[in-house]
UniProtKB/Swiss-Prot annotation:
<dbReference type="GO" id="GO:0009289">
    <property type="term" value="C:pilus"/>
</dbReference>
<keyword id="KW-0281">Fimbrium</keyword>
<dbReference type="Pfam" id="PF16449">
    <property type="entry name" value="MatB"/>
</dbReference>
<keyword id="KW-0732">Signal</keyword>
<comment type="subunit">
    <text>Self-associates. Forms filaments. Interacts with EcpD.</text>
</comment>
<dbReference type="InterPro" id="IPR016514">
    <property type="entry name" value="EcpA"/>
</dbReference>
<comment type="similarity">
    <text>Belongs to the EcpA/MatB fimbrillin family.</text>
</comment>
<protein>
    <recommendedName>
        <fullName>Common pilus major fimbrillin subunit EcpA</fullName>
    </recommendedName>
</protein>
<comment type="function">
    <text>Part of the ecpRABCDE operon, which encodes the E.coli common pilus (ECP). ECP is found in both commensal and pathogenic strains and plays a dual role in early-stage biofilm development and host cell recognition. Major subunit of the fimbria.</text>
</comment>
<dbReference type="InterPro" id="IPR038478">
    <property type="entry name" value="Fimbrillin_EcpA_sf"/>
</dbReference>
<feature type="signal peptide">
    <location>
        <begin position="1"/>
        <end position="22"/>
    </location>
</feature>
Length: 195
């Protein structure tokens, strides 16, 4: 009898102590899309962004990814025009962290290798000087037609500078506080039909 009790006690000890319970580990992430709806088919110039921007910090490069931001341009033709010019200029480009740190990121905008700046216009099309706009060339060909013409192209967006608190610049993005930055990147387009 003693052997049976001892055997049962040993089985209980082995089954109760040798097994560790693994805890489940879960992680969650949220994807957010900006959403608005607008239709304008009567304005002389309409520029529509085709998507939103999302920059992710990559630890391996200690920096943020760049993004291609596509846009659609529609113009109304002017049959009296002899030349057409389309330019762009950066208006806003600061993202601010959504906490109390005041940390900021500045977004750079590039069009076909040329920086789009706040201080001057970037020429995208200038038919009088032979700048026909690459992917926007349908506009250079249709600016003097009697109907509307559309074309699509894109900017390259990248994080070009940042601060830890709104004033202290960082040279190493790994020193930025953890969190999410939000804001608008706005580019103004100007079209000129010359008669």
């Amino acid at each position: 009898m003693k052997k049976k009790v001892l055997a049962i006690a040993l089985v209980t000890v082995f089954t109760g102590t040798g097994v560790a319970q693994a805890a489940d580990v879960t992680a969650q992430a949220v994807a957010t899309w900006s959403a608005t709806a607008k239709k304008d088919t009567t304005s002389k110039l309409v520029v529509t962004p085709l998507g939103s921007l999302a920059f992710q910090y990559a630890e391996g490069i200690k920096g943020f990814n760049s993004q291609k931001g596509l846009f659609d341009v529609a113009i109304e033709g002017d049959s009296t025009a002899t030349a057409f010019k389309l330019t762009s200029r950066l208006i806003t480009n600061t993202l601010t962290q959504l906490d109390t740190s005041g940390s900021t990121l500045n977004v750079g905008v590039d069009y076909n290798g040329a920086a789009v700046e706040k201080t001057g216009d970037t020429v995208m099309i200038d038919t009088a000087n032979g700048v026909l706009g690459g992917n926007l060339s349908p506009l250079a060909n249709g600016y003097n037609a009697s109907n509307r013409t559309t074309a699509q192209d894109g900017f390259t967006f990248s994080i070009i500078s940042g601060t830890t608190n709104g004033t202290t610049a960082v040279t190493d993005y790994s020193t930025l506080p953890e969190g999410i930055w939000s804001g608008d990147v706005s580019v103004q387009f100007d079209a000129t039909w010359t008669s």
